[in-house]
Regions:
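Intrinsically disordered, low-complexity, charged/polar segments
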Residues: 2-3, 59-80
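Mixed-charge, Lys/Arg-rich low-complexity intrinsically disordered regions
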Residues: 2-22
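Serine/proline-rich low-complexity intrinsically disordered segments, especially terminal tails, linkers
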Residues: 17, 43, 48-51, 73, ...
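Basic/aromatic-rich interaction segments and small domains that mediate binding to polyanionic partners
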Residues: 35-63
Length: 80
């Protein structure tokens, strides 16, 4: 069995509102792509608190208004 290593790179896939995000999504926060680990909103659904983890494993929270757009990233095979 041959083991192959593929080169993966991050690509901008979409711009989503906070209510469209899911756990494990990769989003842009302060010029850094991070992984979503939790999502919560206020009772009115107008403010979303997104907990995330950066590439060093450090966790933080960012807030978005319900009508803001968040850049969603995905890994793609750069060899194709």
């Amino acid at each position: 069995m041959n083991a192959t290593i593929t080169n993966m790179e991050l690509k901008l896939a979409d711009s989503l509102t906070p209510d469209q995000l899911m756990i494990e999504d990769l989003i842009m926060v302060e010029d850094e792509v991070v992984e979503v680990i939790a999502i919560a909103s206020d009772s009115a659904g107008s403010i979303y608190a997104i907990a995330y983890k950066d590439e060093f494993g450090e966790k933080n929270v960012v807030q978005f208004k319900h009508d803001e757009f968040v850049s969603l990233y995905v890994y793609v095979d750069s060899d194709t």
